[in-house]
Amino acid sequence: MEMASAFTLNVRLDNIAIITIDVPDEKMNTLKAEFASQVRAIIKQLRENKELRGVVFISAKPDNFIAGADINMIGNCKTAQEAEALARQGQQLMAEIHALPIPVIAAIHGACLGGGLELALACHGRVCTDDPKTVLGLPEVQLGLLPGSGGTQRLPRLIGVSTALEMILTGKQLRAKQALKLGLVDDVVPHSILLEAAVELVKQDRPSSRPLPVRERILAGPLGRALLFKMVGKKTEHKTQGNYPATERILEVVETGLAQGTSSGYDAEARAFGELAMTPQSQALRSIFFASTDVKKDPGSDAPPAPLNSVGILGGGLMGGGIAYVTACKAGLPVRIKDINPQGINHALKYSWDQLEGKVRRRHLKASERDKQLALISGTTDYRGFAHRDLIIEAVFENLELKQQMVAEVEQNCAAHTIFASNTSSLPIGDIAAHATRPEQVIGLHFFSPVEKMPLVEIIPHAGTSAQTIATTVKLAKKQGKTPIVVRDKAGFYVNRILAPYINEAIRMLTEGERVEHIDAALVKFGFPVGPIQLLDEVGIDTGTKIIPVLEAAYGERFSAPANVVSSILNDDRKGRKNGRGFYLYGQKGRKSKKQVDPAIYPLIGAQGQGRLSAPQVAERCVMLMLNEAVRCVDEQVIRSVRDGDIGAVFGIGFPPFLGGPFRYIDSLGAGEVVAIMQRLATQYGSRFTPCERLVEMSKRGESFWKTTATDLQ
């Protein structure tokens, strides 16, 4: 049976050809290798029709132009040569589009990313809609790749090398007005007139190319270029710590094209694409992409979710304010905040105002849209307006009696169907639900701080939580723009449980004499966004260490913190960034002063600050404990799958994405190697490093957690 075409040609009465992109049975348009023959057949027809005045590419999808190439194509390549051939095929197709003797215009609405933008770049002009859904970018670097269909060569010539490098090296996505300002698109119009605007551009013959800004012209010359690539290379190396080979290859390929011409540039691009596709970093990053896509499709349970029309929040603090913001402004749901203090409500409202006003200032949002979103948030000091809320999120202090009281009050003041979701980070959900009259509607919904930035939420049903409550809470989390994982109601849940031994070990090394900055730098070099000591300062030392006794009580000695260290720090009124002093000292709010390690920390904890461990040794001790605990979590069914475990670690605590998560990383080392390292560390440093039974068994059998493909679980 012949495959339905993703590209359809229609010629209007005014002799302008419209090529409509509509991948059958898919929500998103993605480019597949098999579409090449369809496009070539259309190009042949275009060349044969001598009456044609021009061509417009447009999507039939309601909210995307082309979201990129189908990543499965890369996974199907077994060698670098196969992946290189794939890139060359894409380059050739784009070259054929660009070589058409009549004007070719891309009419862009929605996501125009990766291969989609490369197709648009191959056109002679581009017009896009002013819709917030319209974004343009080359995000391949986030998959450990580079643009392989000419993007590294066409973009620098269109918008200038420094701007193009920023886009390609970061995967940054531009909104319509930014794209217009940079010259990436020729016009921005309302969606209703997109096609006609593109047709008008065709009738102007070829759009006149605007000259590059003076700065970009200087940087394109040999001297400016040498200086630019040296500076950008240095900055990129500092940012990536040498862990992402794609960034180095991007710089190399773009420079080759500018110095030696496009032919050499395309050749270097295809070759680098093929080689990068085979790197373990790209394979790991693609596995994270597939896993997160999979998690987003997971309903959490087999039951249908209940309707969600409005939400209530208890507590207007930092977490409550952040949760209100994502509920109103991302999920689009009316939110009512209850706080015993009017100042708490004002704080929560100001939090959302600050976020939205920042978007208005950056011209990402209209003032009228800001006001519309803010109008969804209201506050009260009692339960007025709570009677018909479908779900209440509790974000009050970590106190069991207080949370149980909140459950009782919600059951008394809200509808019989109302779900109670606790944002606890450490208290068992079963205990919070212990006195509930409707325990099946009590669940944990654990956000991470700052709420608007952290993508993960943990959803924690207790033994009596209903399947519908789980499904409804998962539905809300997705509407809020979060990636939810469902975890078991055990102390620390998943993320805090694997994080605690990692932080504890860092503190232990401090007491042994390692310096704060050495420990943090070692873990940043390993691939974490910040080191464990700085992380504790950012979270708040009082908040971050509160869970340690809970975990020690539940799991024993392996979770114990070094004696008296935490209490000494807290007794010295050190809470971290929030009060200006922790392990580091912070300048006054609003002032741009670098944080500095406080030398007084060493005598305070009885340490010398004269370490002997190398950076890899420091990282090994912290990371191995995290891996061991993650495996225990699978064994105890705290997480439902290793997919959730990898996503939870990467999105929840910044586990290095290029390693693919704890379970991918164990597989890459081999269970046998992990066991050998842990046994060596146990001999040197104590029984907390004893590898768990599951790891030892896997080592004996030569087993791994994942199958070889990026998308399948074993």
UniProtKB/Swiss-Prot annotation:
Xref: SUPFAM superfamilies: 6-phosphogluconate dehydrogenase C-terminal domain-like (SSF48179), ClpP/crotonase (SSF52096), NAD(P)-binding Rossmann-fold domains (SSF51735)
Pfam family, one: 3HCDH
GO biological process, one term: fatty acid beta-oxidation
InterPro entries, A to Z: 3-OHacyl-CoA_DH_CS, 3-OHacyl-CoA_DH_NAD-bd, 3HC_DH_C, 6-PGluconate_DH-like_C_sf, ClpP/crotonase-like_dom_sf, Enoyl-CoA_hydra/iso, FA_oxidation_alpha_subunit, FadJ
GO function term, MF aspect, one: long-chain-3-hydroxyacyl-CoA dehydrogenase activity
Pathway in which the depicted protein is active: Lipid metabolism; fatty acid beta-oxidation
Residue numbers marked as site, Important for catalytic activity: E118, E140
CDD domains assigned: crotonase-like
Region annotation (3-hydroxyacyl-CoA dehydrogenase) ranges: 306-714
Subcellular location as annotated: Cytoplasm
Region Enoyl-CoA hydratase, residue ranges: 1-190
Region forming the signal peptide: none
Family: In the N-terminal section; belongs to the enoyl-CoA hydratase/isomerase family.
PANTHER family linked: TRIFUNCTIONAL ENZYME SUBUNIT ALPHA, TRIFUNCTIONAL ENZYME SUBUNIT ALPHA, MITOCHONDRIAL
General function of this protein: Catalyzes the formation of a hydroxyacyl-CoA by addition of water on enoyl-CoA. Also exhibits 3-hydroxyacyl-CoA epimerase and 3-hydroxyacyl-CoA dehydrogenase activities.
Assembly description: Heterotetramer of two alpha chains (FadJ) and two beta chains (FadI).
Record protein name field: Fatty acid oxidation complex subunit alpha
Source organism of the structure: Escherichia coli (strain ATCC 8739 / DSM 1576 / NBRC 3972 / NCIMB 8545 / WDCM 00012 / Crooks)
